[in-house]
């Protein structure tokens, strides 16, 4: 995979994305940042609780093994993207290679999950920002959606300017939380294991690594370099595995069996209220970037896979979650 020269089906015709969103080639680091921002979201805050159900050793094994499997899945998806001349998202790829059944199945599954996730992020963003700055969650949710709508309507050409810095901000906040936990870690909290809820972490960890939509978008960003595309997938996947495992162990070392479903709530009770503020800051950043990446992937799927006009696609992405919200 990626290690040999491919002869494109369009006889090496240069790949041009629709509507000029990708006129400039972005660097490898920006491609990595885009995949990370589409992977690390609010799901990371639930990882320590999931790990606490089975113990640190089994929990980290879940994170590493599922992380590597998802990285392999993304590399296989990358192989398909490299060999496909059409500009397609997951739904379109399913139609092209699996027929009408694949299209119907993936449309139902992907679009329903995308809409649900966007609604959850709108609600969560409102709660996080209200905790940080006051006023009501409803006001912040609507304000967030209004700002996000600007990026979704304008497309990735505008969002890519901010994405790298937002991703750096997310990683910095996670690092601050992790290192701040170190003085409070008790080894006794890391010396247990349980098989009672052996499969409990599976869904949580798998959700935390979901990033197929971001990988498809990254292919457009790194269209001129198949080598950098492969590197971006591997580097981003490795960073996510390292961040998830380190964060889960650090939190578990502090809160042990008292780990809460949202990690920062338990940390605030053990270490101090400052963790509650930092946790809300992280949640706001992570959910914001994930919402934008997911929204752009949804928009591009409507455009590329169903040929819906660009502005209509953006309106659907913004208005449908708003109506449900």
Q: Which residues does each predicted region cover?
A:
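Hydrophobic alpha-helical transmembrane segments of multi-pass membrane proteins
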Residues: 35-36, 61-65, 105-116, 146-149, ...
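Helix-loop-helix junctions that connect adjacent transmembrane segments
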Residues: 9-23, 134-143, 155-269
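Transmembrane alpha-helical segments of multi-pass small-molecule transport proteins
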Residues: 32-39, 107-111, 123, 131-155, ...
